[in-house]
Curated annotation (Swiss-Prot):
InterPro entries: Mediator_Med5_fun. GO terms for cellular component: mediator complex. Component of the Mediator complex. One of its GO terms (biological process) is regulation of transcription by RNA polymerase II. This is Mediator of RNA polymerase II transcription subunit 5. It is found in: Nucleus. Keywords: Activator, Nucleus, Transcription, Transcription regulation. Component of the Mediator complex, a coactivator involved in the regulated transcription of nearly all RNA polymerase II-dependent genes. Mediator functions as a bridge to convey information from gene-specific regulatory proteins to the basal RNA polymerase II transcription machinery. Mediator is recruited to promoters by direct interactions with regulatory proteins and serves as a scaffold for the assembly of a functional preinitiation complex with RNA polymerase II and the general transcription factors. It comes from Kluyveromyces lactis (strain ATCC 8585 / CBS 2359 / DSM 70799 / NBRC 1267 / NRRL Y-1140 / WM37) (Yeast). Signal peptide: none annotated. GO terms for molecular function: transcription coregulator activity. Belongs to the Mediator complex subunit 5 family. Pfam families: Med5.
Length: 1067
């Protein structure tokens, strides 16, 4: 039979939660010692229990000595000794606790125990502990020699004792020699007072009143060699985040309180940013998310380095999430520049309604009180902000979706959806909605789903409960005919309302969190198998589903898993296909090989979709940068070369190849079999855009007299095997049309251009195999194309002599057809971060809102300097959140570059602090005001720069040593695991010195290094690389005597704070 020691070791090695371990422990004790613990005779039973638990305690201590996971073992100890309180076990185990060698384990144990006791409400456990305080609980701690303990462990023990003393109502007499007791308490108080005067005074009063001790005189006289003499390390417990200067031990209580307030403000700010960063970058599926979140307090401020029970950690996460979400939607409601950014909001909704319930289910399946406390503790301002936002959203006449449309009223918000998902996971009863949110609106609980089952509606309209998600999806995908999912709607697309798979995806938000994860993993596994086996039919269908993003299902699946594994599988397919992409070696082209061109186009479209929609980089998944066609395609997607050259072919061979294709397309009117046989998909993807560009330029130059000479050849571009070439055309067109608009061409030239474009975008008919790919390609850049097309329509409308009332008669019908088609595509494509009014189709009105090339509109009303001023005032005021939402700020930095953002921030904040101080906190800071402001800016920049621990260490190493640590490519990815190496590639950005406020002579930058294709440096477009260059220049100036020590310290405040905080950051 397994021993208690083995049970602890096995559970710890498997990461079994403490509550589940406790259940296993009870089973083992009952099975192994049941007969001894139930002897029948009360006296014999007491002796047996003592003996049993003495044996058990020895085994437990042995296990605690040998195991390594300190945090988990500390939770086991707290559950055994206090949550599952038993006098016999505690009396045997507590005296042995201090023989454990691991100070980390002891520190976590005492911190967790103090936290539990401080919040203990169980009257029975309280009464049992009160009875045992005088006999062994207090004495077991006070009798141990604490002189060898480090300061952090010592403080945790003091707080543990303080919590125990709060259980005493009057006073007690400890069963311990009176003199030894006084000496122990006096020694403890002396050391405590030196480390934390306030804590020492408070616990001193508790000892005097509750243990009947007179300590004041002895405390002043004591000078025992046993007392620890605190070193500079002791000051870590009251320092300011990011500060490495030792704290004056004589700080007043007022100063200490002020420091703690500063720490709390900065931690709230960092948690807000950290959560935004995780959600924005699809990193919430990380199994260590809760652990990393809970470590922020200790990493940023040792004065707040208390261990918390798992219940408290989840409560903090829930409350922080709701607060951050309230700030997000409040900004959208009142700062109009944020209004059109909706992707981060959707990710937040998924995290709150789907991911948080899963975290609760994983860590606290049997403890619903956490949810109750969290909902009750949400600040009233947070509730008000959320309710106001959803009320405004539901009442808006422009709204086109309702997250909670299964409810009949408008008083529901994200809190209700959070509870609905908890109910589906059986973590809360259905009555919880009316119990906690009754002030909003009552709900008929019978209508709520109370399990996480997945139900699909088959083709006969019958509901079926799915038992095997992966097999069900395989069957639905096999039955899916893409060409039949487009219901006739003029020349537009409309998804079929009768397909079971599309119905499931359209209602994806209503599916239980557990089943969403299963569906996401099933799609990933099907995709990976299809790419590995070259199952082109299945692969094409999956890629069409994912790129279509029906019901925002793709966004939700990426939140469940992260984009990494998906992009890895598709990139492997693209790179593999490019090496063997000739249509056929037989005399006639093979149909399956031609069909593979469509699949290849879908794969490219999916990669472009991830890049343009979610700004996800593919560099980490490329094995050979020099030879990767996928990477070259993405990097030049908006550019069509003026010279056509085949890869691995001479100029003469390329010329002959081009001539043959032009002859077949525009003269012969058909494509010969030999031409088809001797081509490949890469060549066609470059050939079709080249022909299109040269044709359009020829039309613009007036070289083509009869446009009909081109139209018949252009129609061939819509053949399935040629259609992948349209991807680059759709992106290049945006820039070409901007150029065309600036040249003011005559109307007949414009009419010819619209006719050629109309052929590709608005064909009267399409081959069935081409419908899906055609829709995907048009979707990729439709909004940006509309942006420039509206300029032409507005011009034509304004030129009408009858004004806007007759504008539709003067607009070229071919231009209007193109606009109408793209507007419709946009309206059914779930486009993010764009004002939907800009592409809503209308019949009579042509005055659409203005679109912009960037997501951030820069206008006379909202110039960059005002945008920057608003955000920098937020840093200056030490707000707990940013003025603009996180997604907006990332776009802003991308627009003006990290270097300019940093330099402008340093200049502005330095001036503001010097001239005005910090609003509301002047004279209350233990460190300089500029350092406090620098902390806020530094943490913002750090979370912009790094998303993984590997990135953090690489960036820190580069700043301090100038050496770039690279990592070998790892492309293999398990289906269920999240890709942790989601990091950017460094090509390095040149640093143009704009911080030229002094007459310093800086050394020239080193030339950027070249990198091999097998490594992934991590400094591209980061503040860190700018910081490194600035640091190097200031260091050089100081070493050359151009800067004094004081001037150097003053000039590098923001640099030092960035580096110091980068060392402590949780990512």
């Amino acid at each position: 039979m397994e021993s208690v020691s083995q049970l602890v070791s096995n559970c710890a090695s498997r990461g079994i939660p403490a509550q589940q371990f406790l259940n296993f422990y009870h089973e083992l004790i009952n099975e192994k010692y049941g007969a001894s613990l139930n002897a029948g005779n009360e006296e014999r039973e007491s002796e047996s229990r003592k003996q049993v638990f003495e044996d058990v305690s020895r085994e437990l201590v042995q296990a605690f000595h040998s195991s390594e996971d300190a945090i988990l073992l500390a939770e086991y100890m707290v559950h055994l000794l206090f949550i599952n309180y038993d006098t016999y076990l505690s009396s045997a185990l507590l005296p042995q606790v201090y023989s454990i060698q691991s100070e980390t384990l002891l520190m976590h144990f005492h911190s967790l125990a103090a936290s539990f006791i401080g919040k203990l409400e169980d009257k029975l456990i309280k009464e049992q502990m009160r009875q045992d305080l005088s006999t062994f609980i207090l004495s077991s701690c006070l009798q141990c020699d604490m002189s060898t303990f480090n300061n952090q462990l010592f403080i945790s023990i003091v707080k543990y004792l303080q919590a125990l003393l709060t259980l005493i109502d009057d006073s007690i007499d400890i069963e311990m020699d009176k003199d030894n007791l006084k000496l122990a308490v006096t020694s403890l108080l002396t050391r405590t007072t030196k480390l934390n005067r306030i804590l020492g005074k408070r616990i001193g009063r508790e000892f005097e009143t509750k243990l009947n001790l007179s300590l004041s005189a002895k405390l002043a006289m004591v000078n025992s060699p046993q007392i620890f003499s605190p070193s500079s390390g002791a000051t870590r417990f009251a320092g300011t985040p990011g500060s490495t200067k030792p704290m004056d031990l004589a700080l007043s209580a007022t100063s200490s309180t002020s420091n703690k307030i500063q720490d709390l403000k900065l931690i709230r700010f960092y948690k807000n940013l950290w959560l935004n960063n995780k959600i924005h970058h699809f990193n919430t599926s990380d199994s260590q998310l809760l652990e990393k979140f809970s470590s922020i307090n200790s990493r940023l401020s040792s004065s707040l380095a208390e261990e918390h029970l798992i219940q408290e950690q989840i409560t903090d996460l829930i409350e922080t999430t709701y607060t951050s979400f309230a700030q997000l939607v409040n900004n959208k409601l009142y700062h109009q520049t944020n209004t059109n950014f909706n992707l981060l909001e959707r990710k937040y909704v998924h995290f709150i309604t789907k991911r948080l319930p899963l975290i609760i289910k994983d860590f606290l399946p049997q403890n619903p009180s956490v949810i109750v406390n969290s909902l009750q503790n949400i600040d009233e301002k947070v509730k008000k902000a959320i309710k106001s936002y959803y009320s405004n959203k539901n009442d808006s006449p422009e709204r086109n979706e309702d997250l909670f449309d299964d409810y009949s009223g408008n008083n529901f918000d994200i809190r209700h959806d959070f509870l609905k998902n908890l109910i589906m996971l059986n973590l809360r009863p259905p009555s919880v909605l009316n119990e906690f949110l009754r002030e909003d609106q009552m709900v008929d609980v019978k209508t709520l789903k109370t399990d996480d089952s997945l139900v699909i509606v088959n083709s006969q309209g019958v509901q079926e409960k799915v038992s095997d998600v992966q097999e069900a999806l395989k069957s639905l995908i096999a039955d899916l005919d893409i060409e039949n999912q487009y219901v006739a709607n003029g020349n537009n697309y409309r998804f079929s309302p009768d397909n079971a798979l599309l119905k499931l995806l359209m209602s994806f938000d209503t599916i239980a969190p557990t089943k969403q994860v299963e569906i996401a993993n099933a799609f990933l596994q099907i995709l990976q198998k299809a790419t590995d086996t070259s199952d082109l039919k299945t692969l094409g269908k999956v890629l069409w589903i994912l790129t279509s993003n029906v019901g925002h299902s793709t966004t939700s699946m990426l939140c469940c898993i992260s984009p990494g594994p998906f992009i890895n599988a598709v990139v492997k397919f693209l790179e593999k296909q490019q090496r063997n992409s000739t249509v056929s070696s037989s005399d006639e082209p093979d149909f399956d090989s031609l069909h593979s061109y469509v699949t290849y186009g879908m794969a490219l479209s999916f990669v472009v979709f991830l890049k343009t929609t979610y700004d996800f980089d593919i560099e980490p998944f490329i094995q050979n940068f020099e030879e990767s066609y996928t990477l070259k395609f993405l990097s030049s997607i908006e550019d069509i070369s003026d010279i056509f050259v085949l890869q691995n072919e001479s100029a003469e061979g390329s010329k002959l190849y081009l001539q043959n294709w032009l002859r077949d397309l525009f003269i012969n009117g058909s494509i010969s079999d030999s031409q088809m046989k001797n081509t490949n998909v890469k060549d066609l993807i470059n050939l079709i855009p080249f022909i299109f560009k040269q044709s359009v330029i020829a039309v613009q130059a007036g070289v083509v007299s009869n446009i009909l000479n081109l139209t018949s050849g252009f129609e061939y571009f819509l053949q399935p095997f040629l259609m992948p070439g349209l991807i680059k055309i759709m992106f290049w067109l945006e820039y070409y049309l901007h150029s065309l608009k600036n040249n003011n061409p005559p109307s007949q030239i414009l009419s010819s251009c619209w006719e050629l474009i109309n052929i590709l975008i608005c064909p009267p008919s399409l081959d069935d195999d081409a419908k899906g790919l055609h829709f995907m390609i048009l979707k990729l850049n439709c909004v940006r194309l509309l942006n420039v097309l509206y300029l032409f329509r507005n011009d034509e409308s304004n030129s009408s002599q009858y004004g806007v009332y007759a504008a539709h008669e003067s607009i070229d019908p071919k231009l209007e057809a193109v606009i109408s088609k793209l507007e419709y595509i946009a309206s059914i494509s779930n486009i993010y971060d764009v004002d939907t009014k800009c592409y809503e189709t209308t019949k009579e009105v042509y005055s659409h809102g203005t679109l912009f090339s960037n997501k951030i509109p820069v206008t006379n009303e909202h110039p960059i300097d005002i945008i920057m001023t608003n955000q920098l005032n937020s840093f200056w005021n030490l707000h707990s959140s940013t003025y603009y939402n996180y997604d907006y700020l990332l776009e802003l930095i991308k627009l003006i570059t990290p270097e300019k953002f940093l330099v402008d921030s340093i200049r502005t904040l330095t001036y503001k602090v010097a001239a005005y101080g910090i609003p509301g906190v002047q004279g209350k800071l233990n460190t300089s005001a500029i350092e406090q402001v620098a902390n806020f800016l530094a943490y913002f920049m750090i979370l912009h720069d790094v998303q993984t621990e590997e990135q953090r260490l690489a960036l820190l190493n580069y700043i301090e040593s100038g050496v770039i640590v690279s990592k070998e490519t790892e492309t293999k990815q398990e289906p269920e695991t999240k890709l942790d190496d989601d990091f950017d590639m460094l090509f390095g950005e040149p640093f143009n010195n704009t911080l030229d406020e002094t007459s310093l002579v800086f050394s020239q930058n080193e030339q950027p290094k070249s990198y091999s294709s097998s490594v992934f440096p991590v400094l591209h477009d980061t503040f860190g690389v700018v910081i490194a260059e600035m640091k190097k220049r200031y260091d050089t100036s100081k070493n050359n005597g151009l800067l004094s020590e004081a001037a150097y310290e003053n000039a590098t405040t923001f640099i030092r704070k960035y580096v110091e905080n980068l060392k402590n950051s949780v990512v």
